[in-house]
Each structure stands twice: as C-alpha cells, then as structure tokens.
C-alpha cells in the first residue's frame, strides 16, 4: 500500500508501481544449497503429521496443509512462522524421502539477502529468530523499486529555498501546513 497526503499531493498523485523486470526469472532451485545439513530434513513423525493434517483439511474443503516447492518453479511465500515446521515451503528430495525445510542461507537468498549471507555464520541469531526475521522481511529490491517511484512523486512537490528542501503546499489544501524540513 502506498499513500500520499491529499493536502500536499492532491487527490490523484501520478504514482505507478514499478514494472516487473524483463528477462529470465530465477528458479527456486537456483537458491538451493547442494548438500544441506540433515537437520533440515523433516522427521518421519513431522512428515506423517503434516500429511494427515493436510488430508483432514482437504476432506473438510479447507486449504490448510503444506506446500511442496518445485525447484524448476517459483517459491511459495516465506512467513515468520516458518520456524515451526517449514510447511509452507518444503523441498522435495525424491520418492520415498521426507522433504526438507529451507536452510537459513536459502531463506536469506529467497528474500534477497544472498549477497550478505554466504554461510550460516553470517546470521548471528538462532534458526528460529532468523526464520522469523526473514519471514517478516520485505525483499530489498522490491522496497528499493517502490521507494524510487515514491520519490518521483515527491519530486513533483519539492522546492529548494535558502538551502532547505521543502515540500510545497498544495494550493487546494484546506488547512495550512508547515513546510517539512529534511536534511
């Protein structure tokens, strides 16, 4: 959601969400580690539980369950609850093998932090906290692109005066506002 103050920007500022970049998109498999630690493989007990839980809700007509991610496709959404059982994004390991969860490095790559997180040691918190933080995060490239579009709209209302950057008052504004001073 992007909002602008009507008193400053009017009823319909010329904001446009950024276009999706052209060209090939990365696949889910491109973020996966070749030999992840075994601790990320679901136990027989957890895998059985998730399958029973999904079947119970499927019978009721609900959409609850787990999500198996196709390495050749795109990922499902990583949420802050991922640390609990990883059920939103489970990685297929082959027939008769329990799926696995994302590693912390893979979760970082998925959310756009691949340049900052090369190894597990680059994340100074527990797995639980890392999954929560990555799951609550917004992909930095998306925030950057939306932020640039917001700045374009803001530039239409900016006036340089005596070394200060001021937002111009909308002439149709009902109430007078003090100019915002930024550094």
Residue positions per predicted region:
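Acidic-aromatic/histidine active-site loop/patch
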Residues: 143
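FAD-binding beta-loop-beta segment adjacent to the flavin cofactor pocket
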Residues: 82-127
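Short, flexible loop/turn segments with low-complexity composition
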Residues: 14-17, 156-172
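Short, hydrophobic alpha-helical segments
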Residues: 147-158
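A helicase ATPase "motif cassette" and its flanking acidic/Ser/Thr-rich regulatory loops
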Residues: 139
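Short Lys/Arg-rich cationic patches that frequently serve as NLS/NoLS or arginine-rich RNA/DNA-binding motifs
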Residues: 168-183
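Class I S-adenosyl-L-methionine
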Residues: 1-77, 81-83
